[in-house]
Amino acid sequence: SISQNIKDNLLTPNNLLQAEPKLLLQDFVSDPHNYISILSAIAKGAHVVKEIVASTGLASGHVSKYLSVLKDSGFVERRIPLTLKKNSRAGRYHITDPYLRFYFRFLETRQEQLALGIQDQALAEIKKHLIDFIGTYTWEEICREWTIRAGAKEELPYLPDQVGSTWNAEAQVDVVGYNSMEKTLILGE
């Protein structure tokens, strides 16, 4: 089962996958502590600088600097609503790697417990939130990738030249495929 695989492969003490995120960060920065705090905040739903500042307690200027390093090194990306210009201030930060996203959402804050072999609480928390976690991030990404491929295979009424998502204060659309020449779009939620 997925629960048993998570327990056996991710929650065991001294697991190489447990060390991977910090080892990766250390390749880019000498002191990963604040970067880890920012990645944990993003993984738990803080996607704009203001939310990340509130979650981490770091100064806004420092958060912006750290986010720039994380973005340049490929750990995070800044997504803009597809309907807005690239320099829009409405961008949201997301962790690019699915495993790192999972690690910083579920495992980072439980390192001491896991090192002592205390797995049940972590597993219960993961089970409780896994479906929402997959739906919120992984499933949406798969759907956006499908939109690109389906357009290329002519399985859609047109070929989207841009695929992403869009949002404002009231609503979010998870999948938007837009053809700028034909001024057509497909929406998926």
Explain the meaning of each model-derived region.
Residues 1-104:
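Interdomain hinge/linker elements that couple catalytic modules in large macromolecular machines
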Residues 91-189:
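A cross-kingdom feature that marks ATP-driven nucleic-acid transaction machinery
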